[in-house]
Amino acid sequence: MRIIGVISDTHGLLRPEALAALEGSELILHAGDVGDVRILDALERIAPVHAVYGNTDWGEVRQRLPRTVEVDLGSVDGAAASGTPAGPIAHVHHGDRELDLDPAAAGIVLVVSGHTHRPLVEERGGVLYLNPGSAGPRRFTLPATVARVRVGDEGKLEAEIVALP
């Protein structure tokens, strides 16, 4: 079983509790509003990171990151493989309205987004939709959260939201 850490909306704040919750991940996905490239560097010390920029990311963060990314959850570093992927494919983008494809038709089994700060785990049409919530400054009386996705041997996905103290 493989563990994928998922984080979003750090807005320049990487809590020690978020790092602790992501420890043990073999791959980390960041769904935007990173706030500072040093956050990506800190996450890279845990596992390879695939991230997208969000609507509040500018400068070096926006230059360094794509708007969307597809990640092979079965490969060692998550790199999108040419040819047959090693495992299930995840599509990562920031805003929930940025999805411009039919995930099931594209062979995508996990869609990760951020932006709303509201955690969400929902399966629709064979696709798991995940918003890890916000790990950054608290807003809208919502808790600070991250998520973990377990990838089973058969490619089965199980997601959980982890509330940060």
Region spans (language model):
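N-terminal active-site segment of His-dependent metallophosphoesterases
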Residues: M1-V49, D57-R67, A86, L142-T145
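Active-site neighborhood of phospho(di)ester-bond hydrolases with catalytic His/Asp-centered motifs
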Residues: V6-S8, L27-D33, H50-N55, H91-H94, ...
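Residue-level signature for short turns and capping positions that connect secondary-structure elements
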Residues: H11-G12, R97-E98, A135, L164
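Short, acidic/turn-prone active-site loops that include or flank metal/cofactor-
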Residues: G12, D33-G35, Y53-G59, V76, ...
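Short, flexible, glycine/charge-rich loop motifs used to bind or transfer phosphoryl groups or to couple energy/partner
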Residues: R15-A20, I39-A42, A80, E98-D102, ...
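Helix-adjacent hinge/juxtasegments
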Residues: P48-E98, A105
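Binuclear metal-dependent phosphoesterase catalytic core
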Residues: E70-T84, A106-G107, E123, L130-P165
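Non-DNA-binding regulatory cores of transcription-related proteins
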Residues: D96-R124
